[in-house]
Amino acid sequence: MKKLFLAMAVVLLSACSTFGPKDIKCEAYYMQDHVKYKANVFDRKGDMFLVSPIMAYGSFWAPVSYFTEGNTCEGVF
């Protein structure tokens, strides 16, 4: 039973690392409901950033125009 649990944990960890964003390329700030948030940026396609908010779970695609000054992504993509 212990080996089965360990095997399941390894599979889950590798699935998370396989399907989750890989490398943080830069950080960006965005406004939502008049509050400025900081997010890790993983990728860019056209005018969209793949971001994951710091202090939150999950990631999403957001337009570059959604972000405010202070991001560190200039020259990265």
UniProtKB/Swiss-Prot annotation:
CC annotations in GO: host cell plasma membrane; membrane
Subcellular location: Host cell outer membrane
Gene Ontology terms describing biological process: negative regulation of receptor-mediated virion attachment to host cell; superinfection exclusion
Domain of life: Viruses
Induction profile: Expressed early during infection.
Keyword Hydrolase: no
Disulphide bridges, residue numbers: none
Signal peptide range: 1-15
Membrane topology term: Lipid-anchor
Sections of the chain in a coiled coil: none
Alphabetical keyword list: Early protein, Host cell outer membrane, Host membrane, Host-virus interaction, Lipoprotein, Membrane, Palmitate, Signal, Superinfection exclusion
Lipid-carrying residues in chain (N-palmitoyl cysteine): 16
Lipid-modified sites (S-diacylglycerol cysteine): 16
Function per UniProt: Inhibits of the adsorption of T5 to its FhuA receptor. By this means, T5 within cells excludes superinfection by T5 and other phages using FhuA receptor as a ligand.
Protein name: Lytic conversion lipoprotein
Species assigned in the record: Escherichia phage T5 (Enterobacteria phage T5)
Gene name per UniProt: llp
